[in-house]
Amino acid sequence: MPRSVKKGPFVDHHLVKKVMEAQESGNKRPIKTWSRRSMILPDMIGLTIAVHNGKEHIPVYVSENMVGHKLGEFSMTRTYRGHAADKKSK
């Protein structure tokens, strides 16, 4: 069930503060965050945000297509290495 339009998008306050500081200073360094639940806002377009996946920070460059999605969608937490090969068929 999606979030109510009346409430507006959820973004952690500390992340909004860091985004505003990066825009004012014109700094292109990645913004480190653990907030995977925060929604991507139009203010974040063009910035690189390093999103934590449980082990390390994955750099995510924010483009127009990502607005409205959550940061965690672009930082995978699980690695899929494929199914085990069938040894009998060889």
Curated annotation (Swiss-Prot):
SUPFAM superfamilies given in the database record: Ribosomal protein S19
Record bears the keyword Hydrolase: no
Lineage top rank: taxon: Bacteria
Chain ranges passing through the membrane: none
InterPro entries recorded: Ribosomal_uS19 (IPR002222), Ribosomal_uS19_bac-type (IPR005732), Ribosomal_uS19_CS (IPR020934), Ribosomal_uS19_SF (IPR023575)
Keyword Transmembrane: no
GO biological process, one term: ribosomal small subunit assembly
One of the record's GO cellular component terms: small ribosomal subunit
Keywords: Ribonucleoprotein, Ribosomal protein, RNA-binding, rRNA-binding
HAMAP family linked to this entry: Ribosomal_uS19
Biological role stated in the UniProt entry: Protein S19 forms a complex with S13 that binds strongly to the 16S ribosomal RNA.
Protein name, per record: Small ribosomal subunit protein uS19
The species this protein was found in: Hydrogenovibrio crunogenus (strain DSM 25203 / XCL-2)
Organismal lineage: Bacteria, Pseudomonadati, Pseudomonadota, Gammaproteobacteria, Thiotrichales
